[in-house]
């Protein structure tokens, strides 16, 4: 890894018809132009890009990809939820040394959550659910009302129901008699992990927060 950067574009913002908003698309176009200029100035000859749930589900998603091609001259691959899960698994493999046991990997994104059952050799089950941090915020927290117990219970039930098909698929493929560990990725996972550590103590072995650094 030579360089890392991140830009929050909130592409998952939708209008009343579920389309990507002009403001969010403009933010993405501006970001892609900046990244492309950086690649050009550093001699990069191949740019690999992918679009996930926000573009997959928007009625104007493919129109937006055509716009990127026209305005920025970058071709973005629209990947499925399963392919997104597979790439998350490969990302974990590239950044961590997995032991000879089973792992459940969870990635909480803006519009979807991926659950993966895997080991050090292969991904055994790949799942993707239409529940994510930005989606939940847009659907349930547009007002400024505090989250009371009733609202919290409803949201918990909604999330559990949304994830149930993925969880059942993982459970059916779980190997018997093997230790299973969980790995959570994404910024949401890091924030939750830090909250857990602040409550349990940084020396607690039940939860570790690992920030991968470039070499």
Predicted regions and their residues:
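Short beta-strand scaffold segments in enzyme catalytic cores
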Residues: 1, 113-117
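N-terminal glycine-rich anion-binding loops that anchor highly charged ligand groups
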Residues: 1-6, 42
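A secondary-structure boundary/capping signal
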Residues: 3, 51-52
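Pseudouridine synthases involved in rRNA/tRNA modification
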Residues: 9-10
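Helical "lid/coupling" subdomains associated with nucleotide-phosphate turnover
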Residues: 14-42, 52-102, 117-120, 125-215
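Short acidic/polar active-site loop segments enriched in Thr and Asp
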Residues: 45
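Conserved catalytic-loop position in the HRD/HxD motif
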Residues: 107
